[in-house]
Amino acid sequence: MDSAKVKISNKTISSINSGLLIFIGIYFNDTSDDINKLYNKIINLRIFEENNKFSIRDIAGEILLVSQFTLCANTKKGNRPSFKDAMEPEKAEIIFNTIVDKFKESKLKIQTGQFGAFMDVSLKNKGPMTIMLDTKI
């Protein structure tokens, strides 16, 4: 990813250059174990440069974390998504902040969106490469 930014009410609140834009959907049954699995996978995932030789740490990349409950949508029945599998907002915000704190331990540049806000998120994707990580499978 070449760059990403988050705007709220047409004002940029965070932006990064080369690195990862990570959308996080928090499910009702996510735990601290899921946080650790997610963190370890992302920090060590070798997806950068030729032949995918380097991790985000290796390239001293930047990370933009954005909470997105719509990733928890269930579309199996009907034509309207159900979000019943998403964690309730008050608890999800605590989990999201814990995830942010965990990533800050990496000493990489970490930026975030604003939890619960209506955001304009833009991305200049390279490849494109988009990977979905699920700590339950």
Residues of each region from the PLM?
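N-terminal, polar/charged subdomain of small-to-medium soluble alpha/beta proteins
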Residues: 1-78, 90-137
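Short hinge/gating elements
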Residues: 78-85
